[in-house]
Amino acid sequence: MKLKNKKIIVFGGTSGIGLETIKLLLQNGAAKVYAISRNPKKVKIRKKQLVLEKADVLDENSLKALFKRIGKYDVLVSTATGGERAIGPFLSMDMQGYKNSFDKLWGYANVVRYGVKNLSKSGNIVLVSGSPARKPKPGFVAISSAGGAVEAFARAITHELAPIRINLISPGVIDTPMSPLKGKARKDFYKNSTKDNIIKRAGTANEVAKAIIFAIENEFITGTTIDIDGGWILS
């Protein structure tokens, strides 16, 4: 699928991976890109092809109204996690925090369920999971569980959605604004998090966004996961 003249929706499109995806979509000639988040005013890009919309992926009524306003479109991308990400040992983890990690699944389920009605039959969907979904490491039990559920969900509905394609992008450790750490603490965190990887650095949001563009454009892939992880899976 060529991006030129296409109408594309990006959930979580106001920072990090989502924002970088929007930049690439605009650079590649998309006719209209909708950046959806709970705080769309964070986006500083001002282009006539870019439309900022406010919505919460966990609010079903909000999503129904959003898709009704937008109407027919060609591509659905969601990088929005929809909730918190509990980290740490499972046996000492706050169980509500663990349960809330699955908001990622409910958010994706909602955008697919309510978004597919107006999606072109030649269109496609790209969701973002994460390397811990298939290569768990200590302290990542909540992220691994939720990510695994997301990947199972996407594959389970691949046949039902066809001819619409659906694929997953699985990032490893990525340096994005989601991390609250600053300065040396931030540098040390990413160094320690990637020391066992084959590529010993954090990835960038742009590197993940390029994979999303690939998944959109390549018409011979569906129901699969593309790893952008610096070798996390093999570490």
Language-model segments: residues:
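Catalytic loop of short-chain dehydrogenase/reductase
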Residues: 89-104, 108-110, 117, 121-162, ...
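C-terminal substrate-recognition "lid" of short-chain dehydrogenase/reductases
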Residues: 201-228, 233
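Conserved NAD(P)H cofactor-binding loop of Rossmann-fold oxidoreductase domains
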Residues: 77-87, 230-231
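Conserved glycine-rich Rossmann-like NAD(P)H-binding loop of the short-chain dehydrogenase/reductase
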Residues: 26, 30-43
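Rossmann-fold cofactor-recognition segment
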Residues: 47-61
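Conserved Rossmann-fold SDR core element
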Residues: 151, 160-175, 221-228
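N-terminal Rossmann NAD(P)H-binding glycine-rich loop of SDR-like oxidoreductase domains
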Residues: 14, 21-23
